[in-house]
UniProtKB/Swiss-Prot annotation:
Gene encoding the protein: Cpa4
InterPro entries in the record: CPA_M14_CPD (IPR034248), M14A-like_propep (IPR036990), M14A_act_pep (IPR003146), Peptidase_M14 (IPR000834)
GO cellular component term, pick one: extracellular space
UniProt source species: Mus musculus
Cofactor(s) needed: Zn(2+)
Keyword Disulfide bond (UniProt): yes
Subunit structure: Interacts with LXN.
Alphabetic keyword roster: Carboxypeptidase, Disulfide bond, Glycoprotein, Hydrolase, Metal-binding, Metalloprotease, Protease, Secreted, Signal, Zinc
Official protein name in the record: Carboxypeptidase A4
EC assignment: 3.4.17.-
Length: 420
């Protein structure tokens, strides 16, 4: 009871001091050729406009989503009109969505004073950690909570290990979520997945047989500092919270910081950029903690990273258009997983290699995993396709988690049957 009251007070205090986005809008822009992509890239790189890219300019069949501050609406509209670029407004007032989200969180805090964790709500970091503790306590024969490191701001990083025994280094699957702080549906889906595993073990033959052969390691919040900052200050924060010497800008993109074509295409050397790659590979302690743990273990067979948004299921590579050696098998597995996911509610996912499905992205977790011998490496971009973007309502958490579970389970079954 006390911890719930404490977190409720934190939420209330955080909401009062958070950045506001009154009148800010999200534009969806359709590009038709390379020249239009170039023009749009010039626009988003205009620092004085303070635009935030939600979906990057990449391919002609993929719309671009850009958050436009209210003070930049007129110049951006003028630019788009002058260049003949078609656009629509998908979010009329960003602050209105944020206010709804805040109200939902406060309402949920009141409900949870009964002591039950609501999986259909977004939670502060400590509430997620408390629930991880509860799962490990309730199912000690199957689950243990493991501290793998500390963040830049000295918060612990916790992983849940699901294992039926058989040695410390059995074949293993890594499930990652929340590496980009603002993608709240990924953290919420991950903690729901943790409860789903323990609930279905010995009841669902699929997950029971998976755990007979492999261990599952689940990191629900891969960027704790950033996640806390999204709830205390800036809901749309993406990066870590490390300090960059010589710059007023904070943090690096933890999914551009891995040693996989580091500092290559799709990254920036500008610390103020949302895709700043960091000073060197693994410069972010959150990334290094995962790398060290996985390398020390030495027997991971699968690495899955949960993100949002766009409804995509991708595999290596992100840093090159070159086909991965296992591309054909990975594509088959991903398509089967997407089909299983769609079987629940009809949610459609696009499947393909990262670089050609969305955009070039060097230094990603999944490419690092693949380059380090973890063959089954996948990225999920969860709901939606842009109507809410990163602000997916809490009412969609459980539907998203339930369908994602079907995709995850399909991949894990394939790993179970194709250990190498």
């Amino acid at each position: 009871m006390k911890w719930l009251l404490f977190f409720g007070a934190l939420i209330g205090a955080g909401i009062c001091g958070r950045d506001k986005f009154f009148g800010d809008q999200v534009f969806r822009i359709n590009v038709r050729n390379g020249d239009e992509i170039r023009k749009l890239t010039e626009l988003v790189n205009s620092d004085h406009l303070k635009l935030s890219v939600w979906k990057s300019p990449s391919t002609f069949d993929r719309p671009v989503d850009i958050l436009v501050p209210s003070v930049s609406l007129l110049p951006v509209k003028s630019f788009l009109k002058s260049q003949g670029l078609d656009y629509s407004v998908t979010i009329e007032d960003l602050q209105a969505l944020l206010d709804n989200e805040d109200e939902e969180m406060q309402h949920n805090e009141g409900i949870e004073r009964s002591g039950d964790f609501n999986y259909g709500a977004y939670h502060p970091l400590e509430a997620i950690y408390h629930e991880m503790d509860s799962i490990a306590t309730d199912f000690p024969e199957l689950v243990s909570r493991v501290k793998i490191g500390e963040t830049f701001e000295k918060r612990p990083m916790y992983v849940l290990k699901f294992s039926t025994g058989g040695g410390k280094k059995r074949p293993a699957i890594w499930l990652n979520a929340g590496i980009h702080a603002r993608e709240w549906i990924s953290q919420a889906t991950a903690i729901w997945t943790a409860r789903k595993i323990v609930t279905d073990y010995k009841k669902d033959p699929a997950i029971t047989s998976i755990l007979k052969k492999v261990d599952i390691f689940l990191l629900p919040v891969a960027n704790p500092d950033g996640y806390v900052y999204t709830q205390s200050q800036n809901r749309l924060w993406r990066k870590t919270r490390s300090r960059n010497p010589g710059s007023r800008c904070v943090g690096a993109d933890p999914n551009r910081n891995w040693n996989a074509s580091f500092a290559g295409e799709g990254t920036s050397d500008n610390p103020c950029s949302e895709v700043y790659h960091g000073s060197h590979p693994n410069s972010e302690v959150e990334v290094k903690s995962v790398v060290d743990f996985i390398q020390k273990h030495g027997n991971f067979k699968c690495f899955i990273d949960l993100h949002s948004y766009s409804q995509l299921l991708m595999y290596p590579y992100g840093y090159t258009v070159k086909k991965a050696p296992d591309a054909e098998e990975l594509d088959d597995v991903a398509r089967n997983a997407a089909q299983a996911l769609a079987s629940l509610s009809g949610t459609k996912y696009r499947v393909g290699p990262t670089c050609t499905t969305v955009y070039p992205a060097s230094g990603s977790s999944v490419d690092w995993a693949y380059d380090n011998g973890i063959k089954y490496a996948f990225t999920f971009e969860l709901r939606d396709t842009g109507y809410y973007g990163f602000l997916l309502p809490a009412s969609q958490i459980i539907p998203t988690a339930e369908e994602t579970w079907l995709g995850l389970k399909t991949i894990m079954e394939h790993v179970r049957d194709h250990l190498y």
